[in-house]
Design a protein with these regions (language model features):
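Short, acidic loop-to-helix structural element flanking the phosphoryl-transfer center
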Residues: 2-20, 65-72, 124-129, 151, ...
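Glycine-/small-residue-rich active-site loops that bind phosphorylated ligands and cofactors
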Residues: 3, 29, 147
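Active-site phosphate-binding/coordination module
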Residues: 8-112
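Conserved acidic, metal-coordinating active-site core of Asp-based
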Residues: 79, 83-86, 90-191
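Conserved SAM-binding loop
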Residues: 4, 22, 46, 144, ...
Length: 191
């Protein structure tokens, strides 16, 4: 797991004492931020899901949202169906995935840590697109996991070209993360 060393914690405390705003910025949802980080007395805000949401850590209230419109998300999911990749998406601070993908999570991910992460943080549904249509709301992030790294690079370029309103990033070896172009940890800091 990710741990903040005593030295770094001391540096953060000092920076906070000097009047700087210290906000964890992560691809995770608020509840997945390590307790150690949330326990720092100077952490008042958190930038989560790659900047899709900025929250007040005391109240949990959302201060800023940058989400993918539902129709864009559904077009994206249709588009990425051409790749040999599993996909999931964050809606309402939870990662949702087709049950069939979760059952084959090892086919797409050779890294045991990633397999465990996906199994513990994704909620399975029978049909993700139908689930999202039924909810009728924008989504926070779409994630893809690829078996083949060359295909991942092709997909990165093709998605960026076909969806200018989407920001394509990645956080581990075989994934791509798709956020609204205005969801960006840097922009979120300006809020």
């Amino acid at each position: 797991g990710k741990v903040v060393s005593e030295r770094n914690a001391a540096a953060l405390s000092l920076a906070a004492a000097q009047g700087n705003v210290i906000a964890p910025a992560t691809g995770r949802a608020l509840r997945a931020i390590p307790e150690q980080v949330m326990a720092f007395p100077f952490v008042h805000y958190a930038i989560t899901i790659n900047g899709a949401k900025v929250s007040d850590t005391r109240t949990g209230q959302a201060l800023l949202r940058a989400e993918i419109a539902l129709d864009t998300c559904l077009r994206l999911l249709d588009f990425v169906g051409r790749y040999d990749a599993m996909y999931d998406c964050y809606w309402n601070d939870t990662g949702w995935v087709d049950r069939s993908f979760l059952e084959r999570v090892r086919y797409y991910n050779s890294d045991e840590e990633v397999v465990t992460l996906l199994r513990t943080t994704r909620a399975p549904v029978d049909d993700l697109k139908a689930f999202l249509r039924e909810k009728g709301q924008p989504v926070q992030k779409v994630q893809l996991c690829f078996r083949d790294m060359a295909e991942r690079e092709t997909a990165r370029a093709e998605i960026a070209a076909a969806f200018p309103e989407i920001l394509v990033t990645s956080s581990f070896r075989n994934n791509l993360e798709l956020n609204a172009a205005d969801a960006d940890k840097g922009r979120a800091l300006l809020a």
